[in-house]
Amino acid sequence: MSDPDILFRLAETIEARKQSDPHASYVAKLLHDGRDKILKKIAEESAEVLLASKDGDSTHVVRETADLWFHCLVLLAHHNLKLGDVLDELRRREGVSGIDEKAARKAGLADNGIGRMNQDK
């Protein structure tokens, strides 16, 4: 059975691991190694999702997507963002045509967070 709260519990665990010893915690090590290491893991996991999909292996797609989501949650923690921030953005987009939403972003009418991301460099 699906448990939608698992993402919140996982995000809380990741947040708690920020204070852990990087030698004892994979999450703490990723956060200690910095954004570029986290981004490298996200790129790697994204590629693995693509390959699993091309192979038509549904079980592998699920497992690799879980890895990708996990590393995206680590990236959010790195930027001191919360899962709720992403959910709020999805909620904001709900019911809006993808074409209209993309046009609004191109026109600069929607905050896409790029300015905020660049502040963390």
Curated annotation (Swiss-Prot):
EC number(s) from the headed UniProt entry: 3.6.1.31
- Using the UniProt record, name the top-level EC class of this enzyme in a single word: hydrolase
Where is the protein localized?
Answer: Cytoplasm
On the tree of life, the source organism's domain of life is Bacteria
Care to name a GO molecular-function term for this sequence? phosphoribosyl-ATP diphosphatase activity
Q: Where exactly are the transmembrane stretches of this chain?
A: none
Keywords in UniProt for this one? Amino-acid biosynthesis, ATP-binding, Cytoplasm, Histidine biosynthesis, Hydrolase, Nucleotide-binding
Q: Which family does it belong to?
A: Belongs to the PRA-PH family.
- This one is known as Phosphoribosyl-ATP pyrophosphatase
- Native source organism of the sequence: Nitrosospira multiformis (strain ATCC 25196 / NCIMB 11849 / C 71)
Gene name tied to this protein: hisE
